[in-house]
Regions:
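Short, surface-exposed, charged amphipathic helix/loop patches that serve as local interaction elements
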Residues: 1-101
Length: 101
């Protein structure tokens, strides 16, 4: 059976409005629609980099005590955590470039 969900721990963590820190989460493998749907979003049309925010909010199934990881949550991550999640996403989905021999 193929593994479709992967646990992660953010370097710093998401600090919510109540001061709670959320570091551990789960990301599922991406499907084609996870990368297609954001392209229809007006925020992505005006700023293509925003696709990353939407894609991550679609594939992170939970983060700490949060069951709903919205684009607003991703927008409020520390930069190092966003970078970590982008690398984690590429790694679990087999999108990392391999070194040439």
């Amino acid at each position: 059976m193929i593994q479709t969900e992967f646990e992660f721990t953010l370097p710093k963590g998401y600090l919510d409005g109540e001061g709670n820190l959320h570091r551990k989460g789960v990301m599922r493998l991406s499907r084609a629609m996870d990368e297609i749907v954001p392209m229809r979003d007006p925020r992505v049309k005006s700023n293509p980099a925003y696709a990353t925010v939407i894609i991550l909010s679609r594939v992170i199934t939970h983060l700490g005590a949060l069951d709903d990881v919205s684009p607003a949550v991703i927008e409020n991550l520390f930069a190092c955590d966003l970078s970590y999640l982008q690398k984690f996403y590429r790694n679990i989905n087999g999108l990392e470039e391999e070194d040439e021999v």
